[in-house]
């Protein structure tokens, strides 16, 4: 009986339609991040405390809520949807990191981190925070979780200021997270 219920809830979690607006916005962010020639951000002598706080603490809030809210509301379909979107985001992010590592566009290697290193694009931190916030806003309520929205640019800016990613990489990461939400999440029925 448990297997049938598991399979039934999994099948129910697959969306029957997707958000065309969210899909278009996410694809636009991905293309912008890959093809726009953003300037290299100079190395910062000091990083504002707000970005350290975001990097080490605040960016986890949406991710925790994206799992806690479906559990609290006993929303099995929502739990499957956030799991599906998270797995898809992780796979897409890491596959894209490896695929774009040696690609050069506008005289800039997409995989090169600001001050050395590989696998720059897309930013995994940006993709996961984008996924979590977009999931909560799409599945439950745009208005109810609007307060989480500032954590997205704060996380992106923290990654840039800490010299971990380029501007294009964080935009592409956000697009990847939103893309997976648009494909795997549907609004909760009242």
From Swiss-Prot:
Pfam family, one: PAP2
Transmembrane segments annotated in the record for this chain: 22-42, 60-80, 117-137, 145-162, 164-184
pH dependence: Optimum pH is 6.0, activity is seen from pH 5.5 to 8.0.
The protein's name in its UniProt record: Lipid A 1-phosphatase
GO cellular-component term (any): plasma membrane
Additional information: In this organism most lipid A is tetraacylated without a phosphate group at the 4'-position and a phosphoethanolamine residue at the 1-position.
Coiled coil residues, start to end: none
Comment on bound cofactor: Does not require divalent cations.
UniProt key word Transmembrane: yes
Disruption phenotype: Lipid A retains the 1-phosphate group; none of the lipid A species have the usual phosphoethanolamine residue at the 1-position as the enzyme responsible (EptA) cannot act on a phosphorylated residue. In strain 26695 95% is hexaacylated (16 to 18 carbons in length) with both 1- and 4'-phosphate groups, 5% is tetraacylated with only 1-phosphate. In 4 other strains (Cp20-84, Hp7-91, Hsp110-93 and J99) only the 1-phosphate tetraacylated species is seen.
Organism of this sequence: Helicobacter pylori (strain ATCC 700392 / 26695) (Campylobacter pylori)
Membrane topology label: Multi-pass membrane protein
Location(s), subcellular: Cell inner membrane
Role played: Removes the 1-phosphate group from tetra- and probably hexaacylated lipid A species, has no requirement for the Kdo moiety of lipid A. Has no 4'-phosphatase activity. Has no activity on phospholipids (phosphatidylglycerol, phosphatidylethanolamine or cardiolipin). This enzyme has to act before EptA can attach phosphoethanolamine to the 1-position of lipid A.
Involved pathway(s): Bacterial outer membrane biogenesis; LPS lipid A biosynthesis
InterPro entries with a match to the protein in the record: P_Acid_Pase_2/haloperoxi_sf, P_Acid_Pase_2/haloperoxidase
């Amino acid at each position: 009986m448990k297997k049938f219920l598991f399979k039934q809830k999994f099948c129910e979690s697959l969306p029957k339609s997707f958000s065309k607006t969210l899909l278009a916005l996410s694809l636009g962010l991905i293309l912008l991040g890959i093809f726009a020639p953003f300037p290299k951000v100079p190395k910062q002598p000091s990083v504002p405390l707000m970005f350290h706080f975001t990097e080490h603490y605040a960016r986890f809030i949406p991710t925790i809520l994206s799992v806690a809210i479906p559990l609290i509301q006993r929303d099995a379909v929502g739990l499957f949807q956030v799991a599906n979107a998270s797995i898809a985001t992780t796979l897409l992010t890491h596959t894209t990191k490896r695929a774009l590592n040696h690609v050069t566009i506008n005289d800039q290697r997409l995989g090169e981190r600001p001050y050395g290193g590989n696998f720059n694009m897309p930013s995994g931190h940006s993709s996961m925070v984008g996924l979590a916030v977009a999931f909560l806003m799409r599945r439950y309520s745009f208005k109810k979780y609007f307060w989480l929205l500032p954590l997205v640019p704060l996380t992106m800016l923290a990654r840039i200021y800490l010299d971990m990613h380029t501007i294009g990489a964080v935009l592409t990461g956000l697009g990847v997270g939103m893309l997976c939400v648009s494909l795997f999440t549907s609004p909760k029925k009242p």
